[in-house]
Amino acid sequence: MKHNYKVKLFDELGFVRKKCKKCGQWFWTLDEERETCGDAPCDIYSFIGKPITKKPYTYKEMVKEFINFFKEHGHEPIKRAPVTARRWRDDILLTIASIAVFQPWITKGIVKPKANPLVIAQPCIRLNDIDNVGRTGRHLTCFTMGGHHAFNREDDFKYWQDETVELCFNFFKKLGIDEKSITFIESWWEGGGNAGPCYEVITHGVELATLVFMQYEKVGDNYKEIPLKIVDTGYGIERFVWASTGEPTIYDAIFKNIVNKLKEDAGVKDIDKEILAKITEVAGLMDVKDVGDLRKLREEVANKVNIPVEELDKLISPYEDIYAIVDHTRALAFMLGDGIVPSNVKDGYLVRMLIRKTLRHMDRLNLSTPITEIVAMQLNELKDLYPELLDMEDYIMEILEIETNKYRQTIERGKGIVERLLKSKKEIDLENLIELYDSHGLPPEIVKDVAKSLGKDVKIPDNFYTIVAERHENKKEVKEKIKLPEVNVDKTELLFYEYPKMKEFEAKILRIVDDYVILDRTAFYPEGGGQKADTGYIIKGDKKFRVVDVQKENNIVYHKIENLNDELKEGDIVKGVIDWKRRLSLMRNHTATHIINAAAQKVLGRHVWQAGSDVDVDKARLDITHYKRISREELKDIERVANEIVLNNYNIKSIFMDRNEAEEKFGFRIYQGGVVPGNVLRIVIIEDENGNIVDVQACGGTHCQNTGEVGFIKIIKTERVQDGVERLIYSSGLSALKAVQEMEDILEESAEILRCPTEELPKVIKRFFEEWKEQRKKIEELEKKIGELKKFELINKFETIGNYKVLVEKVEANPKEMLNIADNLATENAIVVLLNDKGNILCKRGENVDIKMNELIRYIAKGGGREHLAQGKYEGDVEEIKKKVIEFIKNK
């Protein structure tokens, strides 16, 4: 699409438009002699060893320099968002750019921005180049995107191309970057259905900023102008630091202290900086993703520094590991500090992958410094800019210790898994590697090592971790929705918010379609936010129609009627009656959900986040993120804190707030229940007598007006739903009393059976258990003796078939006793086949028998097992089985 890239600054300063003689891109420059666009691979990284700013900057200094510059130029600084984007979005897991903070609500024009124009320094996580980190000198998984953004409406236009380019140019100038070295490449950006022209801002071979002007929506192959025109800029803070120091790699510029510490610990010798610089320089001249196993990169560098490739490998490999470790641990500091709990799904999977990849790099170096210490160093470096991360240090350290132990156990257990797989497969392909990593946590390098010990080769793609990360980042949850008929009526007036205790109401029927009645107003709560729908009746005259379900879509509430007939007509005035006893239970349990969530955060830590809920009449469940099983003591503490909140009878208020105001005041923790659409949010607040927040959430559910109305809360049990997610099941009010009484009934019944007082149950049960174990031991000894006696009874019934002694016999024994008997008989070259009158069959062989018992049992009966022992079920008589056994052995 054609666009005019010429701006006021270019005219004023005499920029010229040129076409790059190497790549053919158009660009703007002050240097009339320049023939190339300035970007790699058309130009080399000429800043390495020759810093391009007036002074070297640290990461912290560059963040402050960036924020202060744009603040001085009329931009309001705003706080960073968490690196886990699913706190406010359901389409991506991680925050991948500064604009992601404002999507989708602000960029769609539904919500006004917190400030306009604004500036932000947003830490981001991108895993699409994870395999290149450490290898190329420039790739990072964790980086900070500086962004100055303007959201332009027709009636409130801030600035556009002229001002954006001028601001960027002046920022470069302020840093001391030579004006003639700066080029603005004309480009085009598309993403998320939007599009617009952009400039890539280059100096000395490296792109430092991108200036995007979002002004179109892409519809098929066409572009349509959008009313909200957005200035979306991205400045690479770490790249600015790198260019200001002239270090050979971006890692040496950002993580110098930690790199030096790890080099010392690993005993890695200093190598010529020219070698590191050449690797970075050559990597900048090629698309590393196309290099395959990076051999080409190695060969190019080896030629340039006159070192054999094998020697270069030995020199550079430890550096690549160190660089990957310092990058990954910075990412872990943010991911864990922002409350991500390692698990097998979503962002939990990605953080676990990063931990394990880091540990693998550390193992290759034989580092004595634990991962906890390296992340602690990162937290110390970040504490001035991000003090909130340091507040999570205890949690971060515990998580890392737990995950390290899990990783070590996985490696030990996994070797056997790989060996078994290789026995059944000729080779292990990419899908097998991914399955072993996803299901068993086995890094591909371990799989390769085990395979090598068995004489087999496994090929690992250089971009393995990128492939795995992309698969998990792109996984979408498909939630089943009730298909509702489309109707064209006004939105339904919701009475349950304004009048939360309304039990009856009058309304007019607007539409009747299928089994649904649509009213102009309703006090029936539609299913949503984890809370079940209200039920009750719609009454017309003396006729009652049962409401069995209520759903809401596009601001229209649908009332499903049981046995709907033509007595109800559109235009009728009817009365709605809520099943109030049911609603009251739902309200109590929903408020109890908020209370327990607050209690769990207080007892377990700020990493706790709601991962799902289901509010029903008799009980409710709350899924929370937590990295280990909740102990009995912790559970009692959660229950105690929850009931203290109830007894204190705290006020509960529900208010409608502007989205930005709510986020600014309460933070992203308001989205405990998931992503909430819209500009206006309903915020449910529980606060103590001093006005301190006990719990606050964006929630559309029905709630009590104070915590005392909830009544007694009883946590019935906990479950481990999946790794990293704990489920609490609980009841409130009379349902909680009923749950306690049911538990008491079980205790009383148990005490009656054991003929002891309930308070002595633990002691008596322990005694019975010890006695049972003793009796069990005696029974096993007797079974063993019976097996030995049976041996003498059956020893003379063996027949010789070829090289084997074979016994096929029916015995009076259960499967366990049959195994004892077979153990005594199946020695050396013996094959024992035992049957009983219950249809059980067992095949066992001696140590000198080559015939596989799992194959034998499949031939004579139905069953399975291992080569030396198999069990199953048979049909027919002993003679038929015996005939088949002999037939099978002779054929072998």
Swiss-Prot record:
GO terms for biological process: alanyl-tRNA aminoacylation. InterPro entries: aa-tRNA-synth_II/BPL/LPL, Ala-tRNA-lgiase_IIc, Ala-tRNA-ligase_IIc_anticod-bd, Ala-tRNA-synth_IIc_core, Ala-tRNA-synth_IIc_N, Ala-tRNA_lgiase_arc, Ala-tRNA_ligase, DHHA1_dom. Its EC number is 6.1.1.7. Disulfide bonds: none annotated. GO terms for molecular function: alanine-tRNA ligase activity; aminoacyl-tRNA deacylase activity; ATP binding; tRNA binding; zinc ion binding. GO terms for cellular component: cytoplasm. Its cofactor is Zn(2+). The keyword RNA-binding applies. It catalyses: tRNA(Ala) + L-alanine + ATP = L-alanyl-tRNA(Ala) + AMP + diphosphate. Keywords: Aminoacyl-tRNA synthetase, ATP-binding, Cytoplasm, Ligase, Metal-binding, Nucleotide-binding, Protein biosynthesis, RNA-binding, tRNA-binding, Zinc. Binds 1 zinc ion per subunit. Zn(2+) binds at H590, H594, C699, H703. Its main location: cytoplasm. It is found in: Cytoplasm. Gene3D superfamilies: 2.40.30.130, 3.10.310.40, 3.30.54.20, 6.10.250.550, Bira Bifunctional Protein, Domain 2, Threonyl-trna Synthetase, Chain A, domain 2. Belongs to the class-II aminoacyl-tRNA synthetase family. Consists of three domains; the N-terminal catalytic domain, the editing domain and the C-terminal C-Ala domain. The editing domain removes incorrectly charged amino acids, while the C-Ala domain, along with tRNA(Ala), serves as a bridge to cooperatively bring together the editing and aminoacylation centers thus stimulating deacylation of misacylated tRNAs. Catalyzes the attachment of alanine to tRNA(Ala) in a two-step reaction: alanine is first activated by ATP to form Ala-AMP and then transferred to the acceptor end of tRNA(Ala). Also functions in trans to edit the amino acid moiety from incorrectly charged Ser-tRNA(Ala), and maybe also from Gly-tRNA(Ala). NCBIfam families: A-tRNA_syn_arch, alaS. This is Alanine--tRNA ligase.
